[in-house]
Amino acid sequence: MKIDIIGDIHGCYSEFVKLTKKLGYEWDSGIPLHPDGRKLGFVGDLTDRGPQSLQTVEVVYSLVERESAYYVPGNHCNKLYRFFLGRNVQITHGLETTVEEYRALPPSEQAMIRKKFMRLYEAAPLYAQLDNGRLIIAHAGLRRDYIGRNDKKVQTFVLYGDITGETNPDGTPVRRDWAKRYKGSAWIVYGHTPVKQPRIINRTINIDTGCVFGGALTAFRYPEIETISVPSSLPYVPEKFRTFD
C-alpha cells in the first residue's frame, strides 16, 4: 500500500493544502486526490487553535467517505465529539477557536458540520492497523503489547500518550518515552507531542512538528519511509516543543 500520513493539523488548513500539493495530490474536485491512487492518513487532532478547523473537518470527512483516507481520532477530536454530544466540557486549550467558528455558522450549517464530524469520529478505529499489520497509525502512539487491544487503558494511551498521572511545573502531563523502548516490527506513526523535527526511533515516528505553534506540517510517506514538510505561517512558540534525551 502507498500512503501519506499527515501530522496534527489543528485547523492549519492552508498548510494542509500546500503539503498535499507538495505530495502530488490534486484538488480539482475540491479534495486532495492522488493521480497514482495513493491514500492519505491522519493522526487526529484536525481541529483547535488554528484558523480553519471546520474546513479541515469537511475535507477529511469527504476523503474518508470515499475511502481515499484513513483517520484516527486524537484527544482534541475526542473533546470536540463530547462537546457536540452536549457534554459539559471546558471550552479551553484550543477548543474555543473551533467553537467560535461553529457558533458563527447559520443553524443549518451547524447541524451539517456537527453531523459530519460525529459520523467521522464514530466510524473511526481507535488506531488503524494497515498493510497486514506492518503499519499502525495511533494519535499519541501505541506500545507493542497494546497492539490488537481496545480497552480503556489502551484508549487512554492512544489519546494522551504514556502518561504517569503526574504533572510538570508548566501543568503539562509527565509522559514516559515509550518509543525509546519499542521493540515491535510494525511502524507506529503518531503525533500529539510537538517536536521540532520528525522523531524516528525503533520503527516509530512522531510527525507532529507543531504547525499550529509555528513549526511545520509534516507527512510520512509509506512505504518510502521518508518525510515531507511545509513551514507554518503562524508565529513560532518555542516552549511548546518537546525535546528528548
Swiss-Prot record:
<protein>
    <recommendedName>
        <fullName>Bis(5'-nucleosyl)-tetraphosphatase PrpE [asymmetrical]</fullName>
        <ecNumber>3.6.1.17</ecNumber>
    </recommendedName>
</protein>
<dbReference type="InterPro" id="IPR041780">
    <property type="entry name" value="MPP_PrpE-like"/>
</dbReference>
<comment type="function">
    <text>Asymmetrically hydrolyzes Ap4p to yield AMP and ATP.</text>
</comment>
<dbReference type="GO" id="GO:0005737">
    <property type="term" value="C:cytoplasm"/>
</dbReference>
<dbReference type="GO" id="GO:0005525">
    <property type="term" value="F:GTP binding"/>
</dbReference>
<dbReference type="InterPro" id="IPR023937">
    <property type="entry name" value="Bis(5'-nucleosyl)-tetraP_PrpE"/>
</dbReference>
<comment type="similarity">
    <text>Belongs to the PrpE family.</text>
</comment>
<dbReference type="InterPro" id="IPR004843">
    <property type="entry name" value="Calcineurin-like_PHP_ApaH"/>
</dbReference>
<keyword id="KW-0342">GTP-binding</keyword>
<dbReference type="InterPro" id="IPR006186">
    <property type="entry name" value="Ser/Thr-sp_prot-phosphatase"/>
</dbReference>
<keyword id="KW-0533">Nickel</keyword>
<keyword id="KW-0378">Hydrolase</keyword>
<keyword id="KW-0547">Nucleotide-binding</keyword>
<dbReference type="InterPro" id="IPR029052">
    <property type="entry name" value="Metallo-depent_PP-like"/>
</dbReference>
<dbReference type="GO" id="GO:0016791">
    <property type="term" value="F:phosphatase activity"/>
</dbReference>
<dbReference type="InterPro" id="IPR050126">
    <property type="entry name" value="Ap4A_hydrolase"/>
</dbReference>
<dbReference type="GO" id="GO:0016151">
    <property type="term" value="F:nickel cation binding"/>
</dbReference>
<dbReference type="GO" id="GO:0004081">
    <property type="term" value="F:bis(5'-nucleosyl)-tetraphosphatase (asymmetrical) activity"/>
</dbReference>
<dbReference type="Pfam" id="PF00149">
    <property type="entry name" value="Metallophos"/>
</dbReference>
